[in-house]
Amino acid sequence: ALGRRRVNAPNQTVYRMAGLDPSDVDVLQVYDAFSPLVLLSLERLGFCGTGEAADFVQDGRIELGGEIPVNTSGGMLSEGHLNGWSQMMEIVRQLRHQAGARQVPDAKVAQWGTALGDSIIFGNSDV
């Protein structure tokens, strides 16, 4: 079983491998089969501290136009539960600047992740 320390520690491996940190991410797609997973993912991926996600999302910080737009196509709760594939398609759209009204301006770096810390960072040719 995973200990509390292991689950709560932010996943820094993906950032170290990419040579980036959470502040470099322009758009974030997270596994959100259940609403609380968005909050847990923000904490686990290092966008805020443990126990701080509820405050972090206030004032539109994760909305389109916010500090870190999350699940710009609506996430699994809106699009359907395709185990993250629709989120991968949204990442490609964002990085190609083909997301239409959902486009994050000048998106260069996108991240996909889960509340357990699984994560992939993508970049376009502008990175």
Regions found by a protein language model. Give the residues of each.
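Claisen-condensing/thiolase-fold acyl-transfer catalytic domains that form or cleave C-C bonds
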Residues: 1-127
